[in-house]
A protein has these predicted regions:
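C-terminal capping segment of individual leucine-rich repeats
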Residues: 2, 14-17, 39-41, 70, ...
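Surface-exposed loop/turn motifs in large extracellular/passenger domains
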Residues: 15-22, 40-45, 70-75, 123
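Leucine-rich solenoid repeat scaffolds
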Residues: 85-142
């Protein structure tokens, strides 16, 4: 569903109508809010929602999807190239591939997954200039 100028998903786009949905890529669309409809799917493993822009090219996805870490089978979230701001959610090692790169205003605490990052069991894709706290194993410029 990439490159379609979508602003929302249909009401039919949910776990009960798509029970075998494993991967969902909504990148390069126009979502200003994270679509939560498919998150209850027991099969969903990866969501990509990178590069959400309005018609003028402005970054419009600013809010972290609250509750994303409780999605039952999600292991990968690609939410880079947006304008995500403060992340108030505690990360879990269940979601072990996280792309937050090119979110210049992000502020996130990764203390809860630092031991997994250090052990190579959690892949955080980030920029060295981002406000990422709680893990000295990362090469962050302050």
């Amino acid at each position: 569903l990439r490159f379609n100028k979508l602003t929302r998903l249909s009401d039919d786009f949910r776990a009960t109508t798509l029970p075998y949905l494993k991967n969902l890529d909504l990148s390069y669309n126009c979502f200003s809010k994270f679509p939560t409809e498919p998150l209850n799917s027991s099969q969903l493993q990866a969501i990509g929602i990178r590069f959400q822009r309005d018609a003028d090219g402005n970054r419009i996805l600013r809010e972290w999807p609250t509750g994303i870490t409780t999605c039952p089978s999600l292991i990968q979230l690609q939410i880079g190239s947006n304008d995500i701001r403060k992340v108030n959610e505690t990360l879990t090692s269940q979601l072990y591939i996280l792309d937050i790169k090119d979110n210049p205003n992000i502020s996130i605490d990764v203390t809860s997954v630092c031991s997994d990052i250090r052990a190579g069991m959690y892949k955080l894709i980030y920029d060295k200039t981002q406000d990422i706290r709680g893990c000295d194993a990362l090469d962050i410029k302050r």
